[in-house]
From Swiss-Prot:
Molecular function per GO: GTP binding; GTPase activity; translation elongation factor activity
UniProt cross-references to InterPro entries, sorted A to Z: EF-G-like_DII, EFG_II, EFG_III, EFG_III/V, EFG_V, EFG_V-like, G_TR_CS, P-loop_NTPase
Entries under PANTHER family matching the protein: RIBOSOME-RELEASING FACTOR 2, MITOCHONDRIAL, TRANSLATION ELONGATION FACTOR G-RELATED
Family: Belongs to the TRAFAC class translation factor GTPase superfamily. Classic translation factor GTPase family. EF-G/EF-2 subfamily.
Gene name linked to the record: fusA2
Gene Ontology CC annotations of this record: cytoplasm
Sequence positions that bind GTP: 10-17, 74-78, 128-131
Name listed for the protein in its UniProt record: Elongation factor G 2
Localization: Cytoplasm
Domain of life: Bacteria
The species this protein was found in: Borreliella afzelii (strain PKo) (Borrelia afzelii)
């Protein structure tokens, strides 16, 4: 049985969860169709998801179609939960990007497209909501080509449009496809193409062959020899072009009305890759070099933990894993290659949304969940001994909003910290700390909605009431200039007289480069690790009390009597030294700048632009979509608290917006 690991990605409200629910129903995994508005979807199982009608966490579903196992991950469309998308894409082999036939490419569509490009994921495009007023399939196709600089391969043309949309013409099969439900059972029927569509179908078939001939020698040869190009050859070359990411097959439908689902599932099986069709990238722990590993040849276990989820039912964390080679079973001795710890699986599950079926093993290319891990987190590599490889981890964006939190009863503070630990283990974009000045607990996240969801969880899932402060901007800081200095420590530390000198250069880097630590002097590897830990730990809080980013620390000299100093002392004093020298680098404060996409009725565009100008926003573009304008701009995050209320008031409730983090910029005032 073949495997397809796919993700479903889209901007919020493009119909992602509805499409997923239809796929689950049509493949026979569910006997009822979940509905977002009714709050009874299978993939949106969290209470907050059902109440709000949005996807918050990535739900994993396994279903079957035409002798293939399809593992689907339905990912969030809201930018506050972009980490869920990021970690899901890391383990996928293929994806479906859903576009609204009315709204086309939206802000989060661009974000997930870029994320999919980063992980080189082959994709299908599915244009949904073809029955809506303003639906324009060919405009969306044109936008995909122009915006994403890719080649969309149209596989269908619409029969009717807007409220008259009733089916599609399959260009490859040269048939009309009609979709119906009879006694709750889907019924797909085929018919000859009516006369009015014959010429248009022939035109798009020619375009399809022309595109395929750009990379297919076989099709080019058959075309030149005026020979028939068989259905099998066409589908084989579409598959090859999709997997190589040369083309993006485009389909359409109206998921809510069950139109277009079967061809979409067929295309998942026909055109998206199997885990065995692509080698995966890893780092050799023997040579410390990047290598390509063929899953057909490497039979030893290598798996990536891509999600951690707390289950209140069993009061334990469930670890979602993608197996890249070998097999997971409960008898296998495993090793966490990311931290050097030994681990063990106690139970293994096949996951169906929030329900689990216990199984004996997870094989190569498959996705499952395990219990029993004690030292693993998202992004860690699990291997069996002698398979010395490290898989590429998952990178997450920085939190941009923070908030003070305290329990109603002071006696619950320890429990609140335990809850924060649970949540931070499953959500890498959530963190908490304790203010040195006030002793307050501070939580950080990707946006107001992100923190709101977490606070709701604390109340509903953990039965703990808390008080919160107002949301605040999570600033960063960096070095303002290059500084070079030797820090000398001559004092009694841990009962010993310590004389220690460390020479350090701190250089500012460009935004987004991250922090780097280099050594220009020879030093024992154990001591080097201790110094790295000491400096890295200090990055958490700089001169202004904010996390330090985008600096290069160069250690150019160390003078000490190593035998007298323990690792922990090296770690502590290195942190002191860095903190002292960083203070002299003229530290600068950095604020997050957000990208905004505002959708407003045309008559309110002028007022919206004026409001953006008042808060110091920069307008990038204004484009028209029917009765609405789409304004793309950027503004400092601190100016955007409460912007949703301002927009509602300005547009009489008809406007909407999304925003996402763009970059950090020096805060002048």
């Amino acid at each position: 049985m073949g495997i397809r690991n796919i993700g479903i990605m889209a901007h919020i409200d493009a119909g992602k969860t509805t499409t997923t629910e239809r796929i689950i129903y049509y493949t026979g995994k569910s006997h009822k169709m979940g509905d977002v508005d009714s709050g009874n979807t299978i993939t949106d199982w969290m209470p907050q998801e059902q109440e709000r009608g949005i996807t918050i966490s990535s739900a994993a579903i396994t279903c079957h179609w035409k002798e293939h196992q399809i593992n689907i991950i339905d990912t969030p469309g809201h930018v506050d939960f972009t980490a869920e998308v990021e970690r899901s894409l890391r383990v996928l082999d293929g994806g479906i990007v859903i576009f609204s036939a009315v709204d086309g490419i939206q802000a989060q569509t661009e974000t997930v497209w870029k994320q999919a490009e980063k992980y080189e994921i082959p994709r299908l495009a599915y244009v949904n909501k073809m029955d809506r007023v303003g639906a324009n399939f060919f405009k969306v196709v044109e936008d995909i080509e122009n915006k994403f600089k890719t080649i969309p391969l149209v596989l269908q043309i619409p029969i009717g449009n807007e409220s008259n949309f009733e089916g599609v013409v399959d260009i490859i099969l040269n048939k009309e496809l009609h979709f119906a439900m009879e006694n709750g059972i889907p019924k797909l029927t085929y018919s000859q193409i009516r006369e009015e569509f014959i010429e248009k179908t022939a035109l798009f078939k020619k375009k399809l062959i022309d595109i395929l001939s750009q990379f297919s020698e076989e099709i080019t040869q058959l075309f030149l020899e005026d020979k028939e190009i068989s259905l099998d050859v066409i589908k084989s070359e579409i598959r090859r072009g999709t997997i190589s990411r040369f083309i993006i097959p485009v389909l359409m439908g109206t998921s809510l009305k069950n139109i277009g689902i079967e061809p979409l599932i067929d295309s998942i099986v026909d055109y998206l890759p199997s885990p065995f069709e692509k080698s995966f990238t890893a780092f050799s722990l023997d040579t410390n070099k990047k290598i390509l590993v063929d899953p057909n040849e490497n039979k030893k276990l290598s798996a990536l933990v891509f999600k951690v989820q707390y289950s209140s039912v069993i009061a334990a964390h469930l670890y979602f894993v993608r197996v890249y080679s070998g097999e997971i079973n409960s008898n296998k001795k495993i090793f966490n290659a990311s931290n050097g710890k030994r681990e063990k699986f106690t139970k293994i599950f096949r996951v169906f949304s929030n329900k689990n079926e216990q199984i004996d093993f997870v094989k190569t290319g498959d996705i499952g969940a395990v219990l029993g891990l004690k030292f693993s987190v998202t992004g860690d590599t699990l291997i069996e001994e002698n398979n010395n490889i490290l898989l590429e981890s998952v990178m997450f964006p920085e939190p941009v909003v923070l908030m003070s939190v305290e329990p109603e009863r002071s006696s619950d503070e320890v429990r609140l910290k335990e809850i924060f630990e649970i949540i931070s283990k499953e959500d890498p974009t959530f963190s908490y700390s304790e203010s040195k000045e006030t002793g307050q607990l501070i939580i950080s996240g990707m946006g107001e909605l992100h923190l709101e969801i977490i606070l709701t969880r604390i109340k509903d899932e953990f039965n703990l009431n808390v008080y919160t402060g107002k949301p605040q901007v999570s600033y960063r800081e960096s070095a303002g200039k290059i500084v070079k200095e030797v820090f000398e420590f001559n004092n009694i530390f841990a009962g010993k007289n310590i004389n220690f000198k460390i020479g350090m250069i701190i250089k500012p880097l460009s935004r987004g480069e991250g922090n780097k630590i280099d050594f220009e002097c020879s030093i024992d590897s154990t001591i080097k690790s201790a110094i790295l830990r000491g400096i890295t730990t200090t990055f958490v809080s700089g001169a202004f009390g904010y996390p330090i980013i985008d600096i290069n620390v160069i250690i150019f000299s160390i003078v000490c009597e190593i035998s007298k100093i323990s690792e922990s002392v090296f770690e502590s004093i290195s942190g002191f030294a860095f903190h002292s020298i960083f203070q002299k680098s003229d530290p600068i404060r950095l604020e997050p700048i957000m990208l905004l996409e505002i959708r407003t009725p045309i008559e309110h565009t002028g007022e919206i632009i004026s409001t953006l100008n008042v808060i110091g926003g920069v307008i990038h573009s204004v484009s028209n979509i029917g009765e609405y304008d789409l304004i793309k701009s950027e503004a400092a995050f601190e100016k955007l608290f409460g912007y949703a209320s301002i927009l509602r008031s300005s547009t009489k409730g008809r406007g909407s917006f999304t925003m996402e983090f763009s970059y950090f910029k020096e805060k002048v005032s």
